[in-house]
């Protein structure tokens, strides 16, 4: 069946369902599509179709993820749902599914459980900006006092991990009732989508952020100077703009004297473009792959940071043995590898393949870095882990 193409006139937001196993994430995802399909905002997608999530590879890591899309009056959404807990951990750490916001699903019958906590913590670590709560399975709870208690617990948990627990909208409903077409079930879904529309902030578009381009290659063109190539990650670069070359060495200032794409000269390059940028007065040997071009003052080089990391299992082609303190692999940032030393927290002796962990890293050379930057951990050319910078330490 051909997919109906959505008109992309509305602002776009990436979202996902998170929460403990069997609390109803996939049922809720199905219910959203089925309720919104009635007003033409989605293609109704059954639970089984979402649950049979295809496997995808992101930086050598196998992740099962289901994608659905739908729209409300105000926005167009791409929604991710994962079948297993490990898939969430991998997804959030690798950024395979970029989330501008999340719907935390908590079963009213069980209250917050271990993975509820872990997903809230992960969301905080990887920088998910906001979340809305769906208190599911309320049809199984007869006592209103119990519902109130669960809601209080959820709010306390959110506050504990740095989310505004008192402000976050909590919608009570039953995904099952919505799937069965019961009016109270559908009403809760509509209420949830209104909350998501109003509470999850509109993400800043890549072109509105400061200019940043990771350098992939450097050429010398006789009579014209040095050209660096790469894909613009964010912002816009115009001919005549002053820029900085950041990372690996001391930061240098230069000016962009030309932008070209597909051998044509342009006035500007913007986020998503693969461009060549001509640099005034910069020698070929002063620039290298792994540095970035950036708007002056927008990003700094750092060599010490804290990270949340997923370590590949043996089956995924990762290590067969755990690693301990002072492990020294390569950290692959954007376009290059830098050696670094891992310092584990005092209470952790080792990290097992298939685990996720928080630890500190010290690189031998600084990299242009900001919180939220993703990286891979490599050993002898193969990927053994994936991580995200959660805090910069120097």
UniProtKB/Swiss-Prot annotation:
What's the top EC group for this one?
A: hydrolase
Enumerate the residue ranges of region (G4): 136-139
In residue numbers, the region (G2) covers 60-64
| Residues annotated as binding GTP | 19-26, 81-85, 136-139
Name the Enzyme Commission number(s) assigned to this protein: 3.6.5.3
Supply the alphabetized keyword list. Cytoplasm, Elongation factor, GTP-binding, Hydrolase, Magnesium, Metal-binding, Nucleotide-binding, Protein biosynthesis
Q: Where is this region: G1?
A: 19-26
Q: MF terms per GO, please?
A: GTP binding; GTPase activity; guanosine tetraphosphate binding; translation elongation factor activity
Which portions of the sequence form the region G3? 81-84
List localization entries: Cytoplasm
> One GO CC annotation, please?
cytoplasm
Question: Per the database record, which ranges form the tr-type G domain?
Answer: 10-204
Q: Which SUPFAM superfamilies match?
A: EF-Tu/eEF-1alpha/eIF2-gamma C-terminal domain, P-loop containing nucleoside triphosphate hydrolases, Translation proteins
- Please describe what this protein does: GTP hydrolase that promotes the GTP-dependent binding of aminoacyl-tRNA to the A-site of ribosomes during protein biosynthesis.
Q: What is this protein called?
A: Elongation factor Tu
Which gene name belongs to this protein? tuf
């Amino acid at each position: 069946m051909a997919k109906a193409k959505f008109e992309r006139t509305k602002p776009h937001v990436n979202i996902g369902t998170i929460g403990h196993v069997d609390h109803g994430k996939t049922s809720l995802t199905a219910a959203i599509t089925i309720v919104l399909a009635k007003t033409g905002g989605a293609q109704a997608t059954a639970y089984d179709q979402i649950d049979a999530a295809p496997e995808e590879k992101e930086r050598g890591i196998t992740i099962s993820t289901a994608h659905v899309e739908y729209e409300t009056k105000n926005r167009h959404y791409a929604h991710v749902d994962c079948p297993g807990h490990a898939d969430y951990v991998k997804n959030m750490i690798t950024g395979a599914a970029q989330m501008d916001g999340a719907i935390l699903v908590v079963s009213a019958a069980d209250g917050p459980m271990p993975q509820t906590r872990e997903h809230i913590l992960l969301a905080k670590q990887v920088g998910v900006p906001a979340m809305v709560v769906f208190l599911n399975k309320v049809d199984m709870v007869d006592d209103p006092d119990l519902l109130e208690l669960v809601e209080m617990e959820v709010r306390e948990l959110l506050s504990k991990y740095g989310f505004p627990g008192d402000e976050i909208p909590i919608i009570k409903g039953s995904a099952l009732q919505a799937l069965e077409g019961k009016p109270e079930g559908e009403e809760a879904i509509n209420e949830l989508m209104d909350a998501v529309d109003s509470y999850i902030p509109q993400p800043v578009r890549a072109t509105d952020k400061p200019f940043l381009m990771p350098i992939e290659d450097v050429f010398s063109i006789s009579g014209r100077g040095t050209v660096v190539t790469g894909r613009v990650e964010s912002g816009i670069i115009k001919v005549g703009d002053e820029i900085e070359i950041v990372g690996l060495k001391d930061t240098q200032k230069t000016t962009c004297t030309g932008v070209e794409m597909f051998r044509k000269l342009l006035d500007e390059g913007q986020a998503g473009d693969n461009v060549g940028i001509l640099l005034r007065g910069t020698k070929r040997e002063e620039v290298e792959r792994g540095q970035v071009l950036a708007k002056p003052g927008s990003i700094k080089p750092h060599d010490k940071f804290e990270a949340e990391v997923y370590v590949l299992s043996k089956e995924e082609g990762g290590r067969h043995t755990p690693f301990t303190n002072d492990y020294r692999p390569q950290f692959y940032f954007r376009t290059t590898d830098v050696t670094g030393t891992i310092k584990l927290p005092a209470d952790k002796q080792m990290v097992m393949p298939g685990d996720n962990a928080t630890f500190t890293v010290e690189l031998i050379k600084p990299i242009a870095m900001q919180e939220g930057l993703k990286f891979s951990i490599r050993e002898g050319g193969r990927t053994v882990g994936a991580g995200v910078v959660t805090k910069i330490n120097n």
